[in-house]
């Protein structure tokens, strides 16, 4: 049950600096569709270094790598999935920058910044021993910004 106290506890746990660092690490790696292997490797490295067990599932699309991790309560319950893509549109690459307090760069808002927010949410859930039932699954992959 979401109580006002729980919501405030989660808000207080958010480390904006860490989200920006994670997002910049992802944004600074060019990753046009079908070429997101390096950024997927970086995300897996970030998660592993932070103590998460990372899966790299084999797929029928080897040019579209995926990264999977989860926070599991150990108790039966539903699974909430955070899903995001790591590839970017085929425009000239732009490295990360902070402009007027906003993160810019290739994929900053679609969707590497969102993936960084997922990572922070997983950290908070794990460190707060949440959820109490079920699990939270995070998947990140290539092949979203396809030409079709």
Per-region residue spans from a language model:
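Acidic/histidine-rich catalytic neighborhood of metal-dependent amide-processing enzymes
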Residues: 111-112, 116-148
């Amino acid at each position: 049950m979401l109580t006002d106290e729980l919501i405030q506890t989660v808000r207080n746990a958010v480390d904006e600096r860490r989200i920006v660092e994670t997002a910049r690490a992802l944004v600074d790696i060019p990753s046009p569709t079908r070429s997101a292997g390096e950024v997927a490797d970086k995300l897996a490295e970030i998660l592993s270094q932070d103590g998460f067990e990372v899966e790299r599932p084999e797929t029928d699309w080897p040019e579209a790598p995926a990264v999977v991790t989860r926070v599991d309560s150990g108790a039966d319950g539903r699974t909430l999935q955070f899903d995001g893509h790591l590839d970017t549109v085929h425009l000239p690459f732009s490295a990360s920058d902070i402009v007027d307090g906003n993160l810019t760069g290739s994929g900053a808002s679609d969707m590497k910044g969102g993936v960084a927010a997922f990572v922070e949410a997983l950290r908070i859930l794990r460190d707060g021993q949440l959820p109490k039932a079920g699990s939270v699954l995070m998947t990140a992959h290539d092949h979203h910004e396809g030409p079709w």
